[in-house]
Amino acid sequence: MNHFELFRLPFQFELDGGLLSTQFRELQRRFHPDNFATASERDRLMSVQKAAQINDAFQTLKNPISRAEYMLSEQDMDIRGEQKTLQDPEFLMQQMELREELEDISDASDPESALFDFEQQVTALYKSQLSALEQLLNQDDWEEAADAVRKLKFIDKLRYEIERLEETFFD
């Protein structure tokens, strides 16, 4: 049983987050180890394993990147944890330029405003890449979807670096 089947959801990238959360709470309630406190040792162990599976599946599906990676792994294209280099020089150049721009923000005359504008730009890029990924997954274009996930991970890491810089400004 895959993660989508566990939550009785269609195998597709776009998910109803509310339904996912509702199904998660229901499964958590049903398989919570406390419900099996008086059960046999075997049943208690199975409930702990099931609860762990439910938690893992929920964490995977609620995050768009891990959800896409999971979908690819279900198509025998497991890219989780891979160290493959992206072969898109234009995208890589864009990422280098964005990182340079991020490094220069601290020296701007109004760094908070510059960071806000930069964050808006990166958020738009993230949403655009997410939309492209969804299309590729819907078309079962697994190879291109894998590259889209790799790109999305670059952008997501940049978003994390923006958050870290924000913390230094507002702490």
Swiss-Prot record:
<dbReference type="InterPro" id="IPR004640">
    <property type="entry name" value="HscB"/>
</dbReference>
<dbReference type="InterPro" id="IPR036869">
    <property type="entry name" value="J_dom_sf"/>
</dbReference>
<dbReference type="GO" id="GO:1990230">
    <property type="term" value="C:iron-sulfur cluster transfer complex"/>
</dbReference>
<comment type="function">
    <text>Co-chaperone involved in the maturation of iron-sulfur cluster-containing proteins. Seems to help targeting proteins to be folded toward HscA.</text>
</comment>
<dbReference type="GO" id="GO:0051087">
    <property type="term" value="F:protein-folding chaperone binding"/>
</dbReference>
<dbReference type="InterPro" id="IPR001623">
    <property type="entry name" value="DnaJ_domain"/>
</dbReference>
<protein>
    <recommendedName>
        <fullName>Co-chaperone protein HscB homolog</fullName>
    </recommendedName>
</protein>
<dbReference type="GO" id="GO:0044571">
    <property type="term" value="P:[2Fe-2S] cluster assembly"/>
</dbReference>
<feature type="domain" description="J">
    <location>
        <begin position="2"/>
        <end position="74"/>
    </location>
</feature>
<comment type="subunit">
    <text>Interacts with HscA and stimulates its ATPase activity.</text>
</comment>
<dbReference type="InterPro" id="IPR009073">
    <property type="entry name" value="HscB_oligo_C"/>
</dbReference>
<dbReference type="GO" id="GO:0051259">
    <property type="term" value="P:protein complex oligomerization"/>
</dbReference>
<dbReference type="GO" id="GO:0001671">
    <property type="term" value="F:ATPase activator activity"/>
</dbReference>
<comment type="similarity">
    <text>Belongs to the HscB family.</text>
</comment>
<dbReference type="GO" id="GO:0006457">
    <property type="term" value="P:protein folding"/>
</dbReference>
<dbReference type="InterPro" id="IPR036386">
    <property type="entry name" value="HscB_C_sf"/>
</dbReference>
<keyword id="KW-0143">Chaperone</keyword>
<dbReference type="Pfam" id="PF07743">
    <property type="entry name" value="HSCB_C"/>
</dbReference>
